[in-house]
């Protein structure tokens, strides 16, 4: 998918999908995320069957689009690639917001996809009632509207509280 591994603080992973005339970098990032989630689901099933492991592995994913400043960090035995700025920070905060292996993208990213690419993605916001959850397809929400003003988690995401996002759940 033409992603480039980048240096990331903490226990997460970071990949950059760089804009190029020849590739569809945004859809590549989404495709990569969906394939990773599918592989993790398969790994979970295999471990349950083969090893009797009943814990679930999850990789929460946040994807954003924007312009950043790139650089390298020399470290033995190689050089590490890094970028700083709001785009990277928002993607990291989205992965913090995600739960149970979800993929969250910003409306900013979605709006830069072609009409054909948008039509191929299944996305939306999950609405929770008392005992069930429903995906309201083709919708976006601000983080603050999903966490509530008085929720303790709302303060954790204050810096991205007004960011419009949606959950990518698969292909159509």
Residue ranges and their predicted role:
Residues 70, 77-80, 90-91, 112, ...:
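A broad, structure-centric signal for solvent-exposed, well-ordered loop/edge residues
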Residues 39, 43-46, 76, 90, ...:
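Conserved, well-folded catalytic cores of nucleic-acid-processing
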Residues 100-172:
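Intrinsically disordered, glycine/charged-rich C-terminal tails and inter-domain linkers
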Residues 39, 55-56, 89, 120-121:
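Alpha-helix boundary/capping detector
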Residues 1-28, 42-86:
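Catalytic core of nucleotidyl cyclases, primarily class III adenylyl/guanylyl cyclases
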Residues 36:
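Serine endopeptidase catalytic core focused on the charge-relay Asp
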Residues 64-65, 86-108:
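Catalytic/regulatory signature loops of cyclic-dinucleotide turnover enzymes
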């Amino acid at each position: 998918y033409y992603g480039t591994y980048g240096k990331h603080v903490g226990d997460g992973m970071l990949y950059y999908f760089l804009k190029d005339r020849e590739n569809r970098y945004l859809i590549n990032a989404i495709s990569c995320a969906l394939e990773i989630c599918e592989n993790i689901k398969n790994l979970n099933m295999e471990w349950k069957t083969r090893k009797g492991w009943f814990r679930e592995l999850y990789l929460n994913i946040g994807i954003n689009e924007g312009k950043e400043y790139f650089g390298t960090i020399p470290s033995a035995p190689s050089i590490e690639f890094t970028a700083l700025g709001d785009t990277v920070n928002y993607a990291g905060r989205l992965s913090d917001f995600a739960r149970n292996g979800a993929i969250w993208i910003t409306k900013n990213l979605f709006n830069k996809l072609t009409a054909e690419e948008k039509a191929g993605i299944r996305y939306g916001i999950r609405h929770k009632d008392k005992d069930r959850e429903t995906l309201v397809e083709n919708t976006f929400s601000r983080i603050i509207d999903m966490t509530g003003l008085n929720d303790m988690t709302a303060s954790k995401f204050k810096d991205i509280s007004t960011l419009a996002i949606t959950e990518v759940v698969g292909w159509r």
